[in-house]
Every structure is written in structure tokens, then in C-alpha cells.
UniProtKB/Swiss-Prot annotation:
Cofactor: Mg(2+)
Residues noted as binding Mg(2+) 2 in the record, renumbered to the chain: D9, D128
Reaction catalysed by this enzyme: Endonucleolytic cleavage to 5'-phosphomonoester
Textual note on the cofactor: Binds 1 Mg(2+) ion per subunit. May bind a second metal ion at a regulatory site, or after substrate binding.
Function: Endonuclease that specifically degrades the RNA of RNA-DNA hybrids.
Cystine pairings recorded for this chain: none
Protein name from the UniProt record: Ribonuclease H
């Protein structure tokens, strides 16, 4: 099983508001960066969108170490998700994205590692900048 690192971040201006996401996928010395966004969203949705879009790129089951500054995403993957499924996602926010995560993560072994945001972690800083740029692209200017 290939070992992959994924770094991801999400941003929302206004929360909710225009949002962006970015992820870096790394396998050995190869790297791929993705980014995108939505017109009206939250930072948690963008964090999760970054991860889901990154997972869609992988063509075979992998052992993944996910690095995120989102306690929400890390705790959900490492702790909460099992119980959420047992309770049929009752009272869980962003159910659509969590159900998508379950589909796109199938076959992968994922360990989520929380990293402190805005603390000089190079890949997190890159993702943060890209996510903010994507969010800014989606702000409507009033004329």
C-alpha cells in the first residue's frame, strides 16, 4: 500500500460566506496541489471539501497521513465518525460531505494529525494562502 501525505485547509470569508479550499498530496518526491471554492459556505465545509477532493485523485487504496489544522476534521475522522454512522448522522452538520467522505475514503487507511494553524508549518501555510485566494476570487464587488 502506497504511503501518501495530504495537507489540507479551508477558508470562509464571513463564515458563512465565500470560501476556498486547498490540498497538497505528496507521494515520495512527487507533489500535486489542488484548490477550489464555493460562493457561500463555511470554513468547516471547505476543510472537508479539500480532503474529499484530494481523496478523489487517488487511484488505488493508500495509507494516508492527513495533516490539518481543523480539530473538526481530525476529531471526526479519528473519533466521532463511527458513532455518527451508528446514529445515522443524527444532528451532524455537513452530512452530505461526510457521506461523500465515506465513499471516497473507502479502501484507504487514514490517520488524521492535527497541526496548529498559522504556526510556520510550510504545507499548511501554502494551503491556507491558496484557500484564502480561492475565497477572495468568489467575493462579489459592489459597484
Amino acid at each position: 500500500m502506497q504511503e501518501i501525505e495530504i495537507f489540507c485547509d479551508g477558508s470562509s470569508l464571513g463564515n458563512p460566506g465565500p470560501g476556498g479550499y486547498a490540498a497538497i498530496l505528496r507521494y515520495k518526491d512527487k507533489e500535486k496541489t489542488i484548490s477550489g471554492g464555493e460562493e457561500f459556505t463555511t470554513n468547516n465545509r471547505m476543510e472537508l471539501r479539500a480532503l474529499n477532493e484530494a481523496l478523489k485523485i487517488l487511484k488505488r487504496p493508500c495509507r494516508i497521513t492527513l495533516y490539518s489544522d481543523s480539530q473538526y476534521v481530525c476529531q471526526a475522522i479519528n473519533v466521532w465518525l463511527v458513532n455518527w454512522q451508528k446514529k445515522n448522522f443524527s444532528k451532524v452538520k455537513n452530512v452530505d460531505l461526510w457521506k461523500e467522505f465515506l465513499k471516497v475514503s473507502k479502501g484507504h487507511l487514514i490517520m488524521a494529525v492535527w497541526i496548529k494553524g498559522h504556526n510556520g508549518h510550510a504545507e499548511n501555510e501554502r494551503c491556507d494562502s491558496l484557500a484564502k485566494l480561492e475565497a477572495q476570487k468568489r467575493t462579489k464587488t459592489i459597484t
